[in-house]
């Protein structure tokens, strides 16, 4: 109530924020005559002057007014486009590190040039993220005219570029590209062996176009780089043949909302009978259990032409948010192989994760993050909580006059689609263009077949035909055109009205069902009524639509029966529309919780990832590895001689002495010293001997010694990190069961994950030192001897470690904290720079 009174007296926070910018807008306008007097040659000179000022300490805010005025004039000359005042507001919002909500057709692409130029003056680079390669290339080429006019360089990062081309693109003042390319480049950079191979610079300032699509819709999908594992693929075919024998609700239960499967006791017994095993949950049969669950998911939760298509003998994922094909992307955890077995195509080998990150954690690494979209306000709470981003709604340049008709709700799919076809036919007859939005390829082809029967010409825009996408969208606003499109979210291309269309009502939008997100419905509506044009929208629903079926269509069916409604007669009632919106809010809330859960778990991995990637960078940029190697050796001696130190001068029993000797030989190869075979060396003797080994290696390797140390450390780090990711995946899969033991699964995951991480750091040190102490250089070291091999699986490694089972020597119950390890106090700093000072 208080907020309502304050809003009425002083305007909303949004209105107050925009009002505060008015003086700067006026100052920019006042500079326009001065900027008009500049010659073309003076624009790059002005930019060079501003760069010098920023380098000398001037803040970007201090020169914002002048730079925005300069960019406005540059736009007029290079693009014949002048930034409106509301676009200036959008530019200021983006520069301030917020999200600008701007309606379709308000010129978001042009708005981004203002903060991009201003922030490029720091020399640290600006990244502009788009949803696909086509838009990245289009925007870089289109807006590149403006940047080049100002003397700034512009690059574009798209699929298929070499590392050299990527380095060049990232080295530009302003770089366009997709979220996937930027994220994967970050992961790939953290798998490189030499700093010269890195392609990305510091993550400085980022503007995300269609920010809701990238930071919310795609946030549930982590980016994963994987390599082939050694699991056999034959089991997928075997399990696939038994899935039809299992009955839904009898042998397993399906939760469509949560997209999960639960086996019943009867189902478990049936699987055991079919497979001829005693206990499906026995540790030796655990892989059967995993394959069966994925097989049931493939058959009962994933549909062909909705979640994926089969093309050229391959299962290709369809992006559920944009309807685009995602070639090269695979479902993880064996699900993709289960789908391949279901569809009868070749089953590719399962992959093991080598590196992964979520978009949430990738984009939060930027020093400053901003975004723009036509629809963000409905998700403003999530943007604030997860990304600390405020949403500012930018007023339109001209008033909106589009008509949004109430939803038409029918009892059955057949009635609904007949009504849709009637509506299209009526609009086509008078020449009004129509855009039909569907939620899947299957539905778009159903509408297409109805129109073919009525002999209504039309275009289909979906994941199967997106090569012609730009042409189809460009013509969708022309007189008499009918266009059917899967999810228009993120299409990024405006639909401009053709000649004579304004007079007959503008573009008419038809939604064939409500999406689970209100935002995506709003994006479809927003394709009509751009820049004050007329237009209209209507959604057609049926009680057996997925959203209606999952969230309370029974109540509406009861109302229709009581009203005695005849077949083909729709409900058009505000209360029903409100109930549907409430259902959507429930789904949005449910999805928000899933994303928060993902982030909570990924934050544990993120802290570990930061430590590992920081260590990798330190090693790559280090000019002298001797200090780090010496530190590792000292820590391993502490571990090996722990039992000796605990004995406090007393002689060790024969068994303990033998275990200490075995440990020293595993790590340092001391059995090569004849003297040590007769009596266990003291720590001082062993340290002196290891020091001699490393000195000899240093002398033999000459200038390459630094490279050898770095190679062995990075190789050990990558190998152990890969295994650690697999262990963390297994921990995550089983952690949910801790809830049954009255333990908080997230707390247990964090605690056990940290233990696994500490053990992994110990193994990295062991592997590195062992490799150095067992290395023999018999010939002259060649330049490429220790070059990183592209395929890590090709690396062969051998040492003198005895493979027999041995009793382990007495070791510390708590691992010693290494000087480069994360400090146990939780500060996030290295131990040597925190409590270890």
Curated annotation (Swiss-Prot):
<dbReference type="InterPro" id="IPR011130">
    <property type="entry name" value="SecA_preprotein_X-link_dom"/>
</dbReference>
<dbReference type="GO" id="GO:0043952">
    <property type="term" value="P:protein transport by the Sec complex"/>
</dbReference>
<keyword id="KW-0547">Nucleotide-binding</keyword>
<dbReference type="Pfam" id="PF07517">
    <property type="entry name" value="SecA_DEAD"/>
</dbReference>
<protein>
    <recommendedName>
        <fullName>Protein translocase subunit SecA</fullName>
        <ecNumber>7.4.2.8</ecNumber>
    </recommendedName>
</protein>
<dbReference type="InterPro" id="IPR036266">
    <property type="entry name" value="SecA_Wing/Scaffold_sf"/>
</dbReference>
<keyword id="KW-0472">Membrane</keyword>
<dbReference type="InterPro" id="IPR001650">
    <property type="entry name" value="Helicase_C-like"/>
</dbReference>
<keyword id="KW-0653">Protein transport</keyword>
<feature type="binding site">
    <location>
        <position position="823"/>
    </location>
    <ligand>
        <name>Zn(2+)</name>
    </ligand>
</feature>
<dbReference type="GO" id="GO:0006605">
    <property type="term" value="P:protein targeting"/>
</dbReference>
<keyword id="KW-0813">Transport</keyword>
<dbReference type="InterPro" id="IPR036670">
    <property type="entry name" value="SecA_X-link_sf"/>
</dbReference>
<dbReference type="InterPro" id="IPR011116">
    <property type="entry name" value="SecA_Wing/Scaffold"/>
</dbReference>
<dbReference type="GO" id="GO:0031522">
    <property type="term" value="C:cell envelope Sec protein transport complex"/>
</dbReference>
<keyword id="KW-1003">Cell membrane</keyword>
<dbReference type="Pfam" id="PF01043">
    <property type="entry name" value="SecA_PP_bind"/>
</dbReference>
<keyword id="KW-0997">Cell inner membrane</keyword>
<keyword id="KW-0811">Translocation</keyword>
<keyword id="KW-0862">Zinc</keyword>
<dbReference type="GO" id="GO:0046872">
    <property type="term" value="F:metal ion binding"/>
</dbReference>
<feature type="binding site">
    <location>
        <position position="825"/>
    </location>
    <ligand>
        <name>Zn(2+)</name>
    </ligand>
</feature>
<dbReference type="InterPro" id="IPR020937">
    <property type="entry name" value="SecA_CS"/>
</dbReference>
<keyword id="KW-0067">ATP-binding</keyword>
<comment type="subunit">
    <text>Monomer and homodimer. Part of the essential Sec protein translocation apparatus which comprises SecA, SecYEG and auxiliary proteins SecDF-YajC and YidC.</text>
</comment>
<keyword id="KW-0479">Metal-binding</keyword>
<keyword id="KW-0963">Cytoplasm</keyword>
<dbReference type="Pfam" id="PF07516">
    <property type="entry name" value="SecA_SW"/>
</dbReference>
<dbReference type="GO" id="GO:0008564">
    <property type="term" value="F:protein-exporting ATPase activity"/>
</dbReference>
<feature type="binding site">
    <location>
        <position position="835"/>
    </location>
    <ligand>
        <name>Zn(2+)</name>
    </ligand>
</feature>
<dbReference type="InterPro" id="IPR011115">
    <property type="entry name" value="SecA_DEAD"/>
</dbReference>
<feature type="binding site">
    <location>
        <position position="494"/>
    </location>
    <ligand>
        <name>ATP</name>
    </ligand>
</feature>
<feature type="binding site">
    <location>
        <begin position="105"/>
        <end position="109"/>
    </location>
    <ligand>
        <name>ATP</name>
    </ligand>
</feature>
<dbReference type="Pfam" id="PF02810">
    <property type="entry name" value="SEC-C"/>
</dbReference>
<dbReference type="GO" id="GO:0017038">
    <property type="term" value="P:protein import"/>
</dbReference>
<dbReference type="Pfam" id="PF21090">
    <property type="entry name" value="P-loop_SecA"/>
</dbReference>
<dbReference type="GO" id="GO:0005829">
    <property type="term" value="C:cytosol"/>
</dbReference>
<dbReference type="InterPro" id="IPR014001">
    <property type="entry name" value="Helicase_ATP-bd"/>
</dbReference>
<feature type="binding site">
    <location>
        <position position="87"/>
    </location>
    <ligand>
        <name>ATP</name>
    </ligand>
</feature>
<dbReference type="InterPro" id="IPR014018">
    <property type="entry name" value="SecA_motor_DEAD"/>
</dbReference>
<feature type="region of interest" description="Disordered">
    <location>
        <begin position="788"/>
        <end position="837"/>
    </location>
</feature>
<comment type="similarity">
    <text>Belongs to the SecA family.</text>
</comment>
